[in-house]
Each structure stands twice: as C-alpha cells, then as structure tokens.
Amino acid sequence: MIVLALDVYEGERAIKIAKSVKDYISMIKVNWPLILGSGVDIIRRLKEETGVEIIADLKLADIPNTNRLIARKVFGAGADYVIVHTFVGRDSVMAVKELGEIIMVVEMSHPGALEFINPLTDRFIEVANEIEPFGVIAPGTRPERIGYIRDRLKEGIKILAPGIGAQGGKAKDAVKAGADYIIVGRAIYNAPNPREAAKAIYDEIRGV
C-alpha cells in the first residue's frame, strides 16, 4: 500500500532509510535527484538491499525514440515500473510500455497542475483505459479527484496517489477514495525515525 518516495541525493542515505522501513512499504520510488546524485545503478542496489519493487519516476515526456532510450536504461538497471506523462501522446507512451510496465500520469498533486494537466484528465483516462498500464498517478491531496478517476478507470488499473504528508494529503482519505497505493516521501525520510513514521502510516491505512 505504501510507496516510499526517496527524493534524496545520497545513495547510502537512501539505502539506509529503505532498509529501515522495508517491512512497511510495498515499493520504492526513485526520482531524478537520487538517480542524478547516485547513478542509475542505485536502482539495482536498492532492490538487492530490500527486495522491494522499484518505480523509476522519470515522468518521461519526450518523443518516442528518446523515451525508449531512457526507459531501456532504467529497465535494464532493474526498475519494475517507469512513470510516463500521458500528454505526449500514445506513441511516446507506448514506446516505454513496449519495454516494461508503466505508470501514467493523469493528474498531479501540486497546485500548478490545475493550470494545464488536470483540465485534460478525462482525455488521459481514455488513453489509460486503451493502453492499460499497471497504474496511473492521481493526487493524494485531492481525494475527491481520486474517486472521480477511480469511477472512470478500467478495472484492474491501479491508482497511485502522491502528495501524502508534506503536501497535505491524508493517507486514510486517499485509500478510502480509491487509491491502491499511497506515495509518501518527506513525511518518512525526513522524520527523526523513518521506521516509526512508516509504521504509523502503515497502521493508519491497515484495514481501510
């Protein structure tokens, strides 16, 4: 249920945190800060140290060939899923899906998403239902939007909800609204005791 977003630069710090919370998480999400700070091999190292599936949150948004080149590298490094933007169109999304499992962005959790991304949600859901990714990104900061997306999304496609904790989203509200996974970063990795922070969130959503 919990995806740990490891948005840090230092590989050793990332591994230490991941190992301390692995009993309470389902996946680890690595983003550009960690990959740029520690190299793409951090994906393999995290998998070896924790046994947890890895999401490469690159939000790929380029032409098909460039998306394909990047995705080939991260899947080759051991990523189980790659996040891709939907707005670049079916051809760019499919270039990544041909190489492995994908997660498509249909809405984002930050305020700026209301300007350009979120007005196209219905179109993005249509594309997701056609392509059938592993999952889609929906905002944990707006549970009513999770419910809206869940009602229109094809059965079997998972919803992953970022924005839990530091951005103001509540874990239990997101799960009740229909999220299959909640994505939590700073509320865990910046906590004085990341393991206890992860356990508290785990206990909050267990049985919801």
Curated annotation (Swiss-Prot):
Documented EC number(s): 4.1.1.23
CDD domains: OMP_decarboxylase_like
Keywords, ordered alphabetically: Decarboxylase, Lyase, Pyrimidine biosynthesis
Enzymatic class: lyase
GO MF entry, a single one: orotidine-5'-phosphate decarboxylase activity
Any one Gene Ontology BP term: 'de novo' pyrimidine nucleobase biosynthetic process
Transmembrane domains' residue ranges: none
Catalytic residues identified in the record: 59
Residues binding substrate: 7, 29, 57-66, 109, 162-172, 185-186
Pathway in which this enzyme or protein is active: Pyrimidine metabolism; UMP biosynthesis via de novo pathway; UMP from orotate: step 2/2
The reaction(s) this protein catalyses: orotidine 5'-phosphate + H(+) = UMP + CO2
Cellular component, GO annotation: cytosol
Function: Catalyzes the decarboxylation of orotidine 5'-monophosphate (OMP) to uridine 5'-monophosphate (UMP).
NCBIfam families reported for this sequence: PRK13813.1, pyrF
Subunit structure as annotated in this protein's UniProt entry: Homodimer.
Family: Belongs to the OMP decarboxylase family. Type 1 subfamily.
Protein name per Swiss-Prot or TrEMBL: Orotidine 5'-phosphate decarboxylase
Lineage summary: Archaea, Methanobacteriati, Methanobacteriota, Thermococci, Thermococcales
